């Protein structure tokens, strides 16, 4: 079959002085950073949905891209053609992983039976593509938000039959992820929230969502899936309010249903922006709570109130993010998935490469700066000094539960405490 991107062999590293827009300037997969190859640190993934499924339509205009696999035709044949192009792209871009929703890779069909049969055929296609290319699956997931049946949510839907249909999709998508050697399975509740409280039973919907997640965990163990389960927080859009608002909110939810040791987080930069947080904040919070799993690398726009899913371009912001990740030991099953799309005006097929190359170079340079921060150690030293009082006898007695509130009041009076503020620098 003729290559779709026939004017490009593979994207290669040419160094920071290169003027070639189809070459890496900072991402050198084999370069050692803190003793580990850059490729192993970053674990780049390209997403199926924005890259190959979006046709360029928006709220005010029809599709603008005119991709060959988005034309009228036999659905499975078009899905196979899309897979051909996707894996050509992954290979030429030098990404190690990819990610998908079930209906990104397979036609949904007109019934559950058609959905399951179509997906089974496409899983075999994807398995062959993975074997041929060496590209692996970072994570799979089920799209339980696009079809009109999910207008009022999936797990939080008032109708248990919709809940059951969603369960079928998750079972099928998780088993497909398992068969394809996926390293994670993601749960994003696009419509697990509400439009108005006037027709919403918050307690009921929370109980439904909690039970659904418990069943997901049960099924993971039943089929022997060794990957990580990930929830992806987002505060709103398409609903007015989503129940997985941010990292801290999800932690409270997981604790309530006894799932905090079973599920971790997939943090997206743009979702942090929508929640009123920095990307750095959400990563640091997930790490502090022991829930850090993976990253959707993109960016939003602080002046816009929706999910713009732009490619990351801030080395400063992402150096701080990579610094936190390196300090925490780096990725295990997770990675950096580019949940990002070209703009509607970017109709040239090679624009897909320009966007990803710039993003990969941004994250690579951010990694190198973060590594220098680790090696320098100055920031860690200052933080350790700032909290050094907690290593004292008093600090340790407080933390170990050896002093009560009344004990501390007595201690403060007996020692005539008069602490002086120390600069935070």
Swiss-Prot record:
Group of enzyme by EC: isomerase
Gene Ontology biological process terms from the UniProt entry: D-xylose metabolic process
Residues annotated to bind Mg(2+) 1: 232, 268, 296, 339
Domain of life: Bacteria
Keywords for this protein: Carbohydrate metabolism, Cytoplasm, Isomerase, Magnesium, Metal-binding, Xylose metabolism
Catalytic reaction equation(s): alpha-D-xylose = alpha-D-xylulofuranose
Residues annotated as transmembrane: none
Subunit structure: Homotetramer.
Protein's name according to its UniProt entry: Xylose isomerase
Organism per entry: Shigella boydii serotype 4 (strain Sb227)
